[in-house]
């Protein structure tokens, strides 16, 4: 089954399969399935064409997914950077934006360690 340009894994439950689409998490997937009248425990391979089309129409008409969601996210971050708020500055510098410590443990945002020249060890006399 293909939704919003993403092939859903056929061996998983529909509620889990839908989370492979960017912008759809577990809660949203459950809401979509409830609206479409598809049971959550059904496998993706067992979904009928009518049910798949119903899910597809709900996703395309009511939710921002994939490229649309990504671009909206990028625009929100760009807006923060443009107005020069604290969060925008943190994004611009590539540092954590939500108050985490940065003296140690900020490697995900900072990237690989860059060694800085330090003090030389004193030799024995």
Curated annotation (Swiss-Prot):
UniProt record, GO biological process: translation
Domain of life from the UniProt record: Bacteria
Pfam family, one: Ribosomal_S13
A GO CC term attached to the entry: small ribosomal subunit
UniProt cross-references to InterPro entries, sorted A to Z: Rbsml_uS13_C, Ribosomal_uS13, Ribosomal_uS13-like_H2TH, Ribosomal_uS13_bac-type
Keywords: Ribonucleoprotein, Ribosomal protein, RNA-binding, rRNA-binding, tRNA-binding
GO molecular function per UniProt: rRNA binding; structural constituent of ribosome; tRNA binding
SUPFAM superfamilies attached to this UniProt entry: S13-like H2TH domain
Ribosomal protein is among the record's keywords: yes
Subunit structure: Part of the 30S ribosomal subunit. Forms a loose heterodimer with protein S19. Forms two bridges to the 50S subunit in the 70S ribosome.
Role this protein plays: Located at the top of the head of the 30S subunit, it contacts several helices of the 16S rRNA. In the 70S ribosome it contacts the 23S rRNA (bridge B1a) and protein L5 of the 50S subunit (bridge B1b), connecting the 2 subunits; these bridges are implicated in subunit movement. Contacts the tRNAs in the A and P-sites.
UniProt similarity note: Belongs to the universal ribosomal protein uS13 family.
Name of protein: Small ribosomal subunit protein uS13
